[in-house]
Amino acid sequence: MRIDVISLFPEFIKQSVGFGVIGRAQERGLLDLHNWNPRDYAQGNYRRVDDRPFGGGPGMVMLIEPLRACLEAVRAADPQPAPLIYLSPQGVLLNQSRARKLAMLPRMILLCGRYEGIDERFIAHEVNMELSIGDYVLSGGELGAAVVVDAVTRLQEGVLNDAESAKQDSFEAADSLFDYPHYTHPSNHAFGNVPEVLRSGNHVAITRWRRQQSLLRTWLRRPDLIDEARLSKADRLLLDEIKRTHPMDTDRKASASWRGA
C-alpha cells in the first residue's frame, strides 16, 4: 500500500511510524510511505504557507497555492488514483470498520492541517474525505495521520507475523467486542497469579473463559457496544450471568451514554 502524507512537519511523521510493526512493514516493502512538505512548493524568499484570515480573528490560515502545487507533485509522482483525506476534528470518526475500508485502498493521500486550518476553498475543491481521530483538538493533523497510517498498515496482508493476532484485537472481531485479558510467564507473581483455567490445557474451557472475559470487559467498559454486537445464544447466556453479577450502575450508564453521543 502507498500512503502519501502532506505535512509542514514531515519529520514528525517519519519518527512516529518508523518503529515496531509499521517500521518493519516499510523495510519489507509492505508500506510505501512518502512525506511531502507544502513549504517546498511555496513561492518567494520566505516560502510562506499561511496568511491572516479574512474577516479578522486569531491565528493564520494555510494558503491554497502551496497546497495545490504540493498536491500536483504528489499526484504526478504516481499515476494511481488516490483519495485526499484531510485530518480534521470536523471529519467522520475513525473506527475499526472505517480503518478496514481504508486498508482496502491501494493508495491514499493524507493532508495535515496547521494553525487555524486550511483555506476552505481548497477543502471544497480537492478534499475527498475529512477524517477525525476523536472529539478533541490537536495542534495539527500529524498525530492523526500517524494513527491512520498505523491502523491501516497493520491490516495489510503479511504485516503482522500472526494474522490471528489482528483478528482477535479489540473491535476487530465480527462482533466488535473488547479483547480478553492476556498473561505470560511467570504464572505466579506478587501482582497476582495466572487464572487456573489458562494453565489447565482444556481448550474448550479456555475458549469459554476468554469469551466470557471479552463480554465482561465490554459490558463493564463500553456497554453501548453490546447493543451493536452479534451475539450467539451461548453468548447471551454468558451475558445474562454477567449482568446478574455485575449490574450496571448509574455512573456507567451516564458514561456509556456520553461515549455514544
From Swiss-Prot:
Q: Which GO terms describe its molecular function?
A: tRNA (guanine(37)-N1)-methyltransferase activity
Query: Which keywords are on file for this protein?
Result: Cytoplasm, Methyltransferase, S-adenosyl-L-methionine, Transferase, tRNA processing
Report the family membership. Answer: Belongs to the RNA methyltransferase TrmD family.
Official protein name in the record? tRNA (guanine-N(1)-)-methyltransferase
Its top-level enzyme class, in one word, is: transferase
Q: How does it assemble?
A: Homodimer.
What this chain does, per the record? Specifically methylates guanosine-37 in various tRNAs.
What InterPro entries does the database record attribute to this sequence? Alpha/beta_knot_MTases, tRNA_m1G_MeTrfase_C_sf, tRNA_m1G_MeTrfase_TrmD, tRNA_m1G_MTases_N, tRNA_MeTrfase_TRMD/TRM10
Biological process terms in GO annotation: tRNA N1-guanine methylation
Q: Which reaction does it catalyse?
A: guanosine(37) in tRNA + S-adenosyl-L-methionine = N(1)-methylguanosine(37) in tRNA + S-adenosyl-L-homocysteine + H(+)
Query: Per its UniProt record, what CDD domains does this chain match?
Result: TrmD-like
Q: Where does S-adenosyl-L-methionine bind?
A: G113, I133, G134, D135, Y136, V137, L138
Classify the source by domain of life: Bacteria
- Source organism lineage? Bacteria, Pseudomonadati, Pseudomonadota, Gammaproteobacteria, Lysobacterales
Gene Ontology annotations for the cellular component aspect, listed alphabetically: cytosol
HAMAP family from the xrefs?
TrmD
Compartments annotated for it: namely: Cytoplasm
Q: Does the keyword Ligase apply?
A: no
Q: What is its EC number?
A: 2.1.1.228
